[in-house]
Amino acid sequence: RPSDYSPPDWPNQNQVDSRDQQGPAVPPSGPVSMLESVEPTLAEQQFITPDKNPLVEKLMDTVKNDEDTRLYAIIDGSQAIELAYIARMMGHEAYTLFSGDMAAAVAHAGPCLVILDRPLPYLENWVESMGKNAGVLLQSSATLEALCVHLREIFVVKDEEGQDYFFRYYDPRVIRTFLPTCTDQELMEFFGNVTRWICEDETSEAYVSWTRKDSGLVSSAISC
Protein backbone atom coordinates (compact mmCIF):
# COMPACT_ATOMS: atom_id res chain seq x y z
CA ARG A 1 0.00 0.00 0.00
CA PRO A 2 1.45 3.43 -0.83
CA SER A 3 2.75 5.23 2.25
CA ASP A 4 0.65 8.30 1.46
CA TYR A 5 -2.57 6.32 0.99
CA SER A 6 -5.52 7.92 2.74
CA PRO A 7 -8.66 5.79 3.00
CA PRO A 8 -11.56 7.35 1.10
CA ASP A 9 -14.53 8.74 2.97
CA TRP A 10 -17.38 7.92 0.64
CA PRO A 11 -20.06 5.86 2.46
CA ASN A 12 -22.49 7.28 4.95
CA GLN A 13 -23.11 5.81 8.38
CA ASN A 14 -25.75 3.39 7.10
CA GLN A 15 -23.39 1.78 4.60
CA VAL A 16 -20.69 0.69 7.01
CA ASP A 17 -20.47 -1.96 9.66
CA SER A 18 -20.83 -0.02 12.90
CA ARG A 19 -19.91 -3.11 14.90
CA ASP A 20 -16.27 -2.51 13.97
CA GLN A 21 -15.82 1.18 14.54
CA GLN A 22 -12.06 0.95 14.88
CA GLY A 23 -11.76 -0.56 11.41
CA PRO A 24 -9.37 -3.38 10.58
CA ALA A 25 -5.75 -2.92 9.70
CA VAL A 26 -5.38 -3.40 5.97
CA PRO A 27 -3.67 -6.78 5.51
CA PRO A 28 -0.50 -7.39 3.47
CA SER A 29 -0.74 -7.11 -0.28
CA GLY A 30 -0.33 -10.76 -1.29
CA PRO A 31 -3.24 -13.20 -1.40
CA VAL A 32 -3.63 -15.57 1.53
CA SER A 33 -4.95 -19.06 0.79
CA MET A 34 -8.02 -20.13 2.70
CA LEU A 35 -9.88 -23.34 3.34
CA GLU A 36 -6.70 -25.42 3.19
CA SER A 37 -8.70 -28.36 4.45
CA VAL A 38 -12.40 -28.91 4.03
CA GLU A 39 -14.37 -29.55 7.19
CA PRO A 40 -15.28 -33.26 7.41
CA THR A 41 -18.99 -32.58 7.51
CA LEU A 42 -18.74 -30.66 4.26
CA ALA A 43 -16.25 -33.00 2.61
CA GLU A 44 -18.67 -35.87 3.07
CA GLN A 45 -21.51 -34.07 1.34
CA GLN A 46 -22.47 -34.76 -2.24
CA PHE A 47 -22.83 -31.35 -3.84
CA ILE A 48 -25.45 -31.49 -6.56
CA THR A 49 -25.30 -28.93 -9.34
CA PRO A 50 -28.71 -27.21 -9.59
CA ASP A 51 -30.76 -27.30 -12.75
CA LYS A 52 -29.51 -24.64 -15.13
CA ASN A 53 -31.19 -21.29 -14.55
CA PRO A 54 -31.65 -19.00 -17.59
CA LEU A 55 -29.90 -16.29 -15.58
CA VAL A 56 -26.66 -18.26 -15.79
CA GLU A 57 -26.57 -17.81 -19.56
CA LYS A 58 -27.33 -14.10 -19.15
CA LEU A 59 -24.46 -13.75 -16.68
CA MET A 60 -22.11 -15.56 -19.04
CA ASP A 61 -23.13 -13.30 -21.92
CA THR A 62 -22.34 -10.25 -19.78
CA VAL A 63 -18.91 -11.32 -18.56
CA LYS A 64 -17.84 -12.59 -22.00
CA ASN A 65 -17.93 -8.99 -23.21
CA ASP A 66 -14.69 -8.37 -21.29
CA GLU A 67 -12.45 -11.05 -22.74
CA ASP A 68 -9.22 -9.61 -21.30
CA THR A 69 -10.42 -9.87 -17.70
CA ARG A 70 -10.80 -12.62 -15.12
CA LEU A 71 -14.05 -13.27 -13.33
CA TYR A 72 -14.05 -13.41 -9.52
CA ALA A 73 -16.58 -13.89 -6.76
CA ILE A 74 -16.32 -12.32 -3.33
CA ILE A 75 -18.25 -14.55 -0.95
CA ASP A 76 -19.52 -13.25 2.38
CA GLY A 77 -18.67 -16.13 4.69
CA SER A 78 -21.18 -14.92 7.26
CA GLN A 79 -23.99 -15.40 4.74
CA ALA A 80 -23.00 -18.33 2.52
CA ILE A 81 -19.68 -19.96 3.44
CA GLU A 82 -20.88 -23.12 1.69
CA LEU A 83 -20.29 -21.35 -1.64
CA ALA A 84 -16.59 -21.12 -0.79
CA TYR A 85 -16.41 -24.83 -0.03
CA ILE A 86 -18.27 -25.70 -3.21
CA ALA A 87 -15.81 -23.55 -5.17
CA ARG A 88 -12.84 -25.35 -3.65
CA MET A 89 -14.37 -28.75 -4.28
CA MET A 90 -14.87 -27.74 -7.92
CA GLY A 91 -11.19 -26.87 -8.18
CA HIS A 92 -11.34 -23.07 -7.95
CA GLU A 93 -8.71 -21.12 -6.02
CA ALA A 94 -10.05 -19.28 -2.97
CA TYR A 95 -8.31 -16.63 -0.87
CA THR A 96 -9.31 -14.86 2.30
CA LEU A 97 -9.35 -11.09 2.05
CA PHE A 98 -8.30 -10.90 5.69
CA SER A 99 -5.00 -12.09 7.12
CA GLY A 100 -3.11 -12.36 10.38
CA ASP A 101 -5.12 -12.28 13.61
CA MET A 102 -8.24 -11.11 11.80
CA ALA A 103 -8.15 -14.04 9.37
CA ALA A 104 -7.83 -16.50 12.24
CA ALA A 105 -10.66 -14.88 14.18
CA VAL A 106 -13.17 -14.81 11.33
CA ALA A 107 -11.81 -17.49 9.01
CA HIS A 108 -15.25 -18.74 8.00
CA ALA A 109 -17.22 -15.52 8.43
CA GLY A 110 -15.14 -13.00 6.52
CA PRO A 111 -15.04 -12.29 2.78
CA CYS A 112 -13.12 -14.59 0.47
CA LEU A 113 -12.11 -14.13 -3.14
CA VAL A 114 -12.68 -16.99 -5.59
CA ILE A 115 -11.09 -17.08 -9.05
CA LEU A 116 -13.60 -18.25 -11.65
CA ASP A 117 -11.48 -18.98 -14.72
CA ARG A 118 -14.02 -21.71 -15.55
CA PRO A 119 -17.30 -20.08 -14.49
CA LEU A 120 -19.46 -23.11 -15.22
CA PRO A 121 -20.91 -25.01 -13.48
CA TYR A 122 -20.10 -22.87 -10.41
CA LEU A 123 -22.28 -19.97 -11.54
CA GLU A 124 -25.27 -22.30 -11.38
CA ASN A 125 -24.69 -22.63 -7.64
CA TRP A 126 -24.16 -18.87 -7.41
CA VAL A 127 -27.52 -18.12 -9.04
CA GLU A 128 -29.16 -20.72 -6.81
CA SER A 129 -28.00 -18.69 -3.78
CA MET A 130 -29.96 -15.57 -4.78
CA GLY A 131 -31.76 -14.06 -1.81
CA LYS A 132 -28.94 -14.84 0.64
CA ASN A 133 -26.93 -11.68 -0.13
CA ALA A 134 -24.03 -14.08 -0.54
CA GLY A 135 -21.61 -11.64 -2.16
CA VAL A 136 -20.70 -10.00 -5.45
CA LEU A 137 -19.07 -10.87 -8.75
CA LEU A 138 -16.38 -8.71 -10.32
CA GLN A 139 -14.07 -8.61 -13.31
CA SER A 140 -10.51 -7.32 -13.44
CA SER A 141 -7.49 -7.53 -15.71
CA ALA A 142 -5.10 -6.84 -12.82
CA THR A 143 -2.82 -9.44 -11.29
CA LEU A 144 -4.24 -11.33 -8.34
CA GLU A 145 -1.86 -9.54 -5.97
CA ALA A 146 -2.76 -6.09 -7.30
CA LEU A 147 -6.46 -6.88 -7.11
CA CYS A 148 -6.14 -8.04 -3.50
CA VAL A 149 -4.34 -4.81 -2.60
CA HIS A 150 -7.21 -2.77 -3.98
CA LEU A 151 -9.99 -4.88 -2.48
CA ARG A 152 -8.35 -4.61 0.94
CA GLU A 153 -7.76 -0.88 0.71
CA ILE A 154 -11.43 -0.13 0.14
CA PHE A 155 -12.41 -2.05 3.29
CA VAL A 156 -11.45 0.99 5.37
CA VAL A 157 -13.36 4.26 5.07
CA LYS A 158 -13.61 7.40 7.15
CA ASP A 159 -16.67 9.31 8.29
CA GLU A 160 -16.88 13.11 8.38
CA GLU A 161 -15.09 13.16 11.73
CA GLY A 162 -12.19 11.04 10.50
CA GLN A 163 -13.30 7.87 12.29
CA ASP A 164 -12.33 4.62 10.55
CA TYR A 165 -15.07 2.16 9.65
CA PHE A 166 -15.18 -1.23 8.00
CA PHE A 167 -17.05 -0.98 4.69
CA ARG A 168 -18.95 -4.13 3.68
CA TYR A 169 -18.97 -3.35 -0.02
CA TYR A 170 -19.27 -7.06 -0.87
CA ASP A 171 -22.81 -7.08 0.57
CA PRO A 172 -25.23 -6.59 -2.37
CA ARG A 173 -27.49 -4.44 -0.20
CA VAL A 174 -24.60 -2.06 0.43
CA ILE A 175 -22.96 -1.80 -2.99
CA ARG A 176 -26.19 -1.30 -4.93
CA THR A 177 -27.13 1.57 -2.58
CA PHE A 178 -23.64 3.06 -2.52
CA LEU A 179 -22.58 3.15 -6.18
CA PRO A 180 -25.36 5.40 -7.54
CA THR A 181 -24.46 8.05 -4.94
CA CYS A 182 -20.77 8.30 -5.95
CA THR A 183 -19.08 11.24 -7.60
CA ASP A 184 -16.76 10.61 -10.55
CA GLN A 185 -13.74 10.78 -8.23
CA GLU A 186 -15.32 8.34 -5.80
CA LEU A 187 -16.13 5.94 -8.63
CA MET A 188 -12.54 6.07 -9.84
CA GLU A 189 -11.23 5.31 -6.34
CA PHE A 190 -13.74 2.55 -5.65
CA PHE A 191 -13.44 0.79 -9.02
CA GLY A 192 -9.64 1.02 -9.05
CA ASN A 193 -8.50 -1.97 -11.13
CA VAL A 194 -11.99 -3.53 -11.19
CA THR A 195 -13.74 -3.15 -14.53
CA ARG A 196 -17.16 -4.49 -13.56
CA TRP A 197 -19.19 -5.20 -10.42
CA ILE A 198 -22.22 -7.50 -10.46
CA CYS A 199 -24.68 -8.29 -7.68
CA GLU A 200 -28.27 -9.37 -7.24
CA ASP A 201 -30.85 -6.61 -7.31
CA GLU A 202 -33.35 -5.77 -4.58
CA THR A 203 -35.85 -8.32 -5.89
CA SER A 204 -33.31 -11.19 -5.71
CA GLU A 205 -34.67 -12.27 -9.09
CA ALA A 206 -32.17 -10.50 -11.35
CA TYR A 207 -28.67 -9.03 -11.33
CA VAL A 208 -27.33 -5.55 -11.94
CA SER A 209 -23.98 -4.84 -13.57
CA TRP A 210 -21.95 -1.64 -13.09
CA THR A 211 -19.07 -0.34 -15.17
CA ARG A 212 -17.31 3.02 -15.11
CA LYS A 213 -17.10 5.07 -18.31
CA ASP A 214 -15.98 8.63 -19.07
CA SER A 215 -19.62 9.61 -18.71
CA GLY A 216 -19.79 8.14 -15.22
CA LEU A 217 -21.45 5.06 -13.77
CA VAL A 218 -23.17 2.76 -16.26
CA SER A 219 -25.62 0.21 -14.91
CA SER A 220 -27.44 -2.53 -16.75
CA ALA A 221 -29.91 -5.17 -15.69
CA ILE A 222 -29.16 -8.87 -16.15
CA SER A 223 -32.50 -10.63 -16.23
CA CYS A 224 -34.53 -13.16 -18.16
Question: What does each model-identified segment do?
Answer:
Residues 5-11, 17-19, 23-167, 172-224:
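Terminal low-complexity "docking" segments
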